[in-house]
């Protein structure tokens, strides 16, 4: 069977003839400008065997694993090749178009709000002019600062997604901008755009780390602004049971938990006048 006789299944379910040149261009672009890497090594190491009906997403995943397997002390730059290949796949999945074609920030927000992914309150917090300005600040090329381990963690843990279907709704730079825009939405309107830009620059350039609950949930309907929560437990049954309920709710909101049980009486202390001994 020749390449022209092989059809691949695209992400939207349509079939198209296999284009080997397109596969090679993708690998070539992933290796561009990096020392000590080879497109042919990635392709050969993948052991990729094409068959009629193979999914384009599977082709990309095989190439990603191939580049990841080539990472070594002697060839560390394959970590960036694998990262780029993963980014190409991610962008194609999220945008549905060419990986370098990015939607406008406001269009992206409207789409995510409509799907119930982003908090509906964020839409009208900024004017159209402010959304335009925030969109102009986004530098999607900062995605290429990630190593493979870094971008894989972002994809698996922090990007907003439907974990039952695997559908991902945003890319790293949209995530960073929406975190910043959400955190400063209620600040003084004269200064907040500048604050958003500075914060976006700091987190998107990896100069500042964000706690997991905020990075993963602050822009969503969960509205998780707190990272770690301290729960004080008093020396009563009502307080102990209420604390258990609070802990459960905070954990469901992705918050980290700290418990202050210092008020609870010590071991062997009397309960109800000695009817029960505390253990």
Predicted ranges, named:
Residues 1-279:
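Extended catalytic cores of very large enzyme megasubunits
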